[in-house]
């Protein structure tokens, strides 16, 4: 295997690890990065790679939040943690809208909306939305300050925002769910954590869907590229999640909004020129 392909896989994993958790759109970045860094693989495998490396990102959430995610305790005997079970029920509810639309219409959505025009528009529009929401919420105290306070109705509403991200690339799954949560009155830290947890079934399901669609017939070289990309995404995701949680305890999301606007304009200008 050429060393250059390994370096490409590492770099793509780094991009995935950063952009999957920060509300800045992994798709928007991957479209730009793909213009300059192309894996020397088949188109089918490239599509699988770009989705399956998300498994590395998922594992980072499981590692960092294991005690909050595991629904049972072994301390002093086996018993279910009701608050965690309730949280998982809400997460499943939030996943329903995207699942209903995403699975049967995955190919049609990609064909219609996976282009630079859609990505640039959603980057800019949700960037503006972030700034507007933070300006609106300035000085206000959030109504929901813990995940246990999220109701089933709130879970459905957050799920609808996740559906928007599933349909329109560039929205950013984390960006859409955080925007939805902030609009409802969820605190920044709770919105971010709920978004992290919500990613586990969503991204795991998306990875399985791609694997089943394109099959599991990989060469040893392709398996190595997948593993390296996942490992890179895993390590960088841990750092990105820790950074975001520290950052939003002292700052709002407006900086990410401005970044999205700049990136959206850059994507639009680049592809119009090229």
Curated annotation (Swiss-Prot):
Q: Which reaction does it catalyse?
A: di-trans,octa-cis-undecaprenyl diphosphate + H2O = di-trans,octa-cis-undecaprenyl phosphate + phosphate + H(+)
Instruction: State which residue ranges cross the membrane.
Output: 47-67, 85-105, 113-133, 150-170, 196-216, 225-245, 253-273
Q: Which UniProt keywords apply?
A: Antibiotic resistance, Cell membrane, Cell shape, Cell wall biogenesis/degradation, Hydrolase, Membrane, Peptidoglycan synthesis, Transmembrane, Transmembrane helix
Gene Ontology CC entries for this record: plasma membrane
Q: Where in the cell is it found?
A: Cell membrane
User: Its membrane topology, per UniProt?
Assistant: Multi-pass membrane protein
Q: Which GO terms describe its molecular function?
A: undecaprenyl-diphosphatase activity
Kindly indicate whether the keyword Transcription belongs to this entry. no
Q: What does this protein do?
A: Catalyzes the dephosphorylation of undecaprenyl diphosphate (UPP). Confers resistance to bacitracin.
Give the protein family: Belongs to the UppP family.
Extra remark beyond the main annotation: Bacitracin is thought to be involved in the inhibition of peptidoglycan synthesis by sequestering undecaprenyl diphosphate, thereby reducing the pool of lipid carrier available.
HAMAP family to which the protein is assigned, alphabetical: Undec_diphosphatase
Supply the name of the protein: Undecaprenyl-diphosphatase 1
Name its species: Clostridium acetobutylicum (strain ATCC 824 / DSM 792 / JCM 1419 / IAM 19013 / LMG 5710 / NBRC 13948 / NRRL B-527 / VKM B-1787 / 2291 / W)
Classification from the root reads: Bacteria, Bacillati, Bacillota, Clostridia, Eubacteriales
